[in-house]
Amino acid sequence: MQNSHAEGYSTSASGNGTHAEGYDTNANGKGSHAEGIETRTTNEGSHAEGYSTEATGNAAHAEGYDTNASGKGSHSEGIETKATNNSAHAEGYNTEASGSSAHAEGHSTKATVDNAHAEG
């Protein structure tokens, strides 16, 4: 693709302006960036970094270990976190933000309705 760059082992940069680096990384969305081990991006402007992370929403960001950011503009960070709705933010360990603009942080917390905030 145009202006894409892949470096490392088993890496793929298949969208325009994408960058994949590390081991078994895949950057598909336009302008997306996947780095680390087994990371994947699939939408425009998404960024996945760390180990086994996935950023599938437009402008989503997943970082850490086994994290998933699938909502538009969502952010998931830490260990086993999920931000699955638009503008959702999950951070910490085993947290889930599934409401729109929801925020879950800490250990095993869930913010499941729109604009919710869970911490602990």
Q: Each predicted region: which residue ranges?
A:
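Periodic small-residue-enriched repeat registers in elongated scaffold domains
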Residues: 1-120
